[in-house]
């Protein structure tokens, strides 16, 4: 029975998780959520044992950075 008192601190230490991961999640632009992430967010990491770091599946700026050439948009201006 004495060993139970010695194992309890190790068990609590195991459940605590790594310190600072919630801060790292926020730095990456995410937020912590208990359980799984809901649409339109995806899991980008872990905040703790049962807590996911959720973020957007895509960024709007990444979609806006795609450039299209004007000759692709204008009919009859194909150089080939």
Curated annotation (Swiss-Prot):
Keywords: Antibiotic, Antimicrobial, Defensin, Disulfide bond, Secreted, Signal. Residues 1-20 form the signal peptide. It comes from the Eukaryota. Strongly expressed in the tongue, bone marrow, bursa of Fabricius and trachea. Also expressed in skin, esophagus and air sacs. Weak expression in the large intestine, kidney and ovary. Expressed in the vagina and ovarian stroma, but not in the ovarian follicle. Residues 21-22 form a propeptide. GO terms for cellular component: extracellular space. GO terms for biological process: cell chemotaxis; defense response to bacterium. Disulfide bonds join 25-53, 32-47, 37-54. It is found in: Secreted; Cytoplasmic granule. GO terms for molecular function: CCR6 chemokine receptor binding; chemoattractant activity. Induction: Expression in cultured vaginal cells is increased by LPS and S.enteritidis. Its main location: secreted. Pfam families: Defensin_beta (PF00711). Has bactericidal activity. PANTHER family: BETA-DEFENSIN, GALLINACIN-1-RELATED. Belongs to the beta-defensin family. This is Gallinacin-3. The gene is GAL3.
């Amino acid at each position: 029975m004495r060993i139970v008192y010695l194992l309890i601190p190790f068990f609590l230490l195991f459940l605590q998780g790594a310190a600072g991961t919630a801060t790292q999640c926020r730095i990456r632009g995410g937020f912590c959520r208990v359980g799984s992430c809901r649409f339109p967010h995806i899991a980008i990491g872990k905040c703790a044992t049962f807590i996911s770091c959720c973020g957007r599946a895509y960024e709007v700026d990444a979609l806006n950075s795609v450039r299209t050439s004007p000759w692709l948009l204008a009919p009859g201006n194909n150089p080939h």
